[in-house]
Amino acid sequence: MAQIREIDVGEVRTRFARGWHCLGLSRTFKDGKPHAVEAFGTKLVVWADSNGEPKVLDAYCRHMGGDLSQGEIKGDSVACPFHDWRWGGNGKCTDIPYARRVPPLARTRSWITMEKHGQLFVWNDPEGNTPPPEVTIPEIEQYGSDEWTDWTWNQIRIEGSNCREIIDNVVDMAHFFYIHYAFPTFFKNVFEGHIAEQYLNTRGRPDKGMATQYGLESTLESYAAYYGPSYMINPLKNNYGGYQTESVLINCHYPITHDSFMLQYGIIVKKPQGMSPEQSDVLAAKLTEGVGEGFLQDVEIWKNKTKIENPLLCEEDGPVYQLRRWYEQFYVDVADVTEKMTGRFEFEVDTAKANEAWEKEVAENLERKKREEEQGKQEAEV
């Protein structure tokens, strides 16, 4: 009897990744109101003080468990809707209007925050360490330039999937053909320290996807890098039959529970010469819409697949196990991070065999489509 490969689904994680996590655009939280964010297995409350500085606390009041995100901002504090206990951004209770004094132990958890290029980040570390400067999120030079648009931003709540599902895409060359309808003509990964890089060139499939809409050959040059466990910066150069666009895509997420996460994505676009600001914003919205459609294609797979710790791979599948080893550094204590997790690793996938097979498949699809169209015309003439 032949041996059967069984799927190992592994164990449920007991901690959330150490690192910077983007909660969204900073301006979202600067409207004078408290905002609820479900993350890291709990609920957070996010608001901005009178200086516009973002503050993040655990949302549940340490007095009687009221939800601070349902309260009000009073001065620089967030006031609980239950008994009006007021909490400052440092986690200390600042006032209890009906009490003679504030109990010395009236403290809640405050979260370290950072603002970069119009986005708000929080630092998560199960050990309680402060963020090392070498793992900070890099600046995006294009942001804030008159030559580039502002962020167009969206988010999707993903249920029934662990964050690692989206990380696996960093090394998944073949899914770009089957899920995103593109020929990957170049594909390379580099992992080092807390950064995982993907170098990708693609050509659109003429039988499916965006390339079929315009009848033009489309190409893409992409450099994507995860800085830590959850935040990817992805400069893109698209060419649609000679019309070129440059953009910077953000692909990021934060965990809600161990089997759900909030996927966020946003784009800034270089304004084409001769295009008005309004037209540039429309272009950015269209590109974001296209990215969203791509993510939804992934989401449909994630919703229906199983977790698999022992994937059976061929050589064109890329360094899945090496990527997961890199990713594991964010789920262990700092003292347990090993050289194998952070040491430099490079791998380029040979795409020749894959593209040869895919070219044949696409040619057959186009030929079949042509026959079906001709048959349809003949039937219409009868």
UniProtKB/Swiss-Prot annotation:
Induction: By 4-androstene-3,17-dione (AD). Homotrimer. The two-component system 3-ketosteroid-9-alpha-monooxygenase is composed of an oxygenase component KshA and a reductase component KshB. Gene3D superfamilies: Naphthalene 1,2-dioxygenase Alpha Subunit, Chain A, domain 1, Rieske [2Fe-2S] iron-sulphur domain. InterPro entries: Cholesterol_7-desaturase (IPR050584), KshA-like_C (IPR045605), Rieske_2Fe-2S (IPR017941), Rieske_2Fe-2S_sf (IPR036922). In vitro, catalyzes the introduction of a 9alpha-hydroxyl moiety into the ring B of 3-ketosteroid substrates such as 1,4-androstadiene-3,17-dione (ADD), 4-androstene-3,17-dione (AD), 4-androstene-17beta-ol-3-one (testosterone), 4-pregnene-3,20-dione (progesterone), 23,24-bisnorcholesta-4-ene-22-oate and 23,24-bisnorcholesta-1,4-diene-22-oate. It catalyses: androsta-1,4-diene-3,17-dione + 2 reduced [2Fe-2S]-[ferredoxin] + O2 + 2 H(+) = 9alpha-hydroxyandrosta-1,4-diene-3,17-dione + 2 oxidized [2Fe-2S]-[ferredoxin] + H2O. The keyword Ion transport does not apply. The keyword Iron applies. Residues 20-122 form the Rieske domain. Keywords: 2Fe-2S, Iron, Iron-sulfur, Lipid degradation, Lipid metabolism, Metal-binding, Oxidoreductase, Steroid metabolism. GO terms for molecular function: 2 iron, 2 sulfur cluster binding; 3-ketosteroid 9-alpha-monooxygenase activity; iron ion binding. Its EC number is 1.14.15.30. This is 3-ketosteroid-9-alpha-monooxygenase, oxygenase component. It holds the Pfam family Rieske. It comes from the Bacteria. CDD domains: Rieske_RO_Alpha_KSH (cd03531). Fe cation binds at residues 169, 175, 180, 298. SUPFAM superfamilies: Bet v1-like, ISP domain. Its cofactor is [2Fe-2S] cluster; Fe cation. One of its GO terms (biological process) is lipid catabolic process. [2Fe-2S] cluster binds at residues 61, 63, 80, 83. It is an enzyme of class 1 (oxidoreductase). Binds 1 [2Fe-2S] cluster per subunit. Binds 1 Fe cation.
